[in-house]
From Swiss-Prot:
GO MF annotations, alphabetized: double-stranded DNA binding; RNA binding
Xref: InterPro entries: Alba-like_dom_sf, DNA/RNA-bd_Alba, DNA/RNA-bd_Alba-like
Post-translational modification: Acetylated. Acetylation at Lys-9 decreases DNA-binding affinity.
Function: Binds double-stranded DNA tightly but without sequence specificity. Involved in DNA compaction.
CC terms in the record's Gene Ontology section: chromosome; cytoplasm
Gene symbol of the encoding locus: albA
Major site of localization recorded for this protein: cytoplasm
Full protein name: DNA/RNA-binding protein Alba
GO biological process: chromosome condensation
Modified residues (N6-acetyllysine): 9
Length: 87
């Protein structure tokens, strides 16, 4: 699981650097995000593909839904994405 980058609230370039670092030692990197961070995950994948490593491939994209309990105790659905980049 060391080749997984979880996308959160930091700036996009932080995650781009994290993915590039993972790609130096792994042939595949998994970018994961939930909820509002999904667009940032797509931005990270596209920046790497278009600006840094032109020949990298998007091996797989999975979308789904997680059930999460909010502070009120109710279950809410949160969208998820998993993007697999491969050399």
């Amino acid at each position: 699981m060391d080749n997984v980058v979880l996308i959160g609230k930091k700036p996009v370039m932080n995650y781009v650097v994290a993915v590039l670092t993972q790609l130096t030692s792994n042939d595949e990197v998994i970018i994961k995000a939930r909820g509002k961070a999904i667009n940032k995950a797509v931005d990270v994948a596209e920046m790497i593909r278009n600006r840094f490593i032109k020949d990298i491939k998007i091996k797989k994209i999975e979308i789904g839904t997680d059930k999460v309990k909010n502070p009120d105790g109710r279950e809410v659905n949160v969208s998820t994405i998993e993007i697999v980049l491969a050399k």
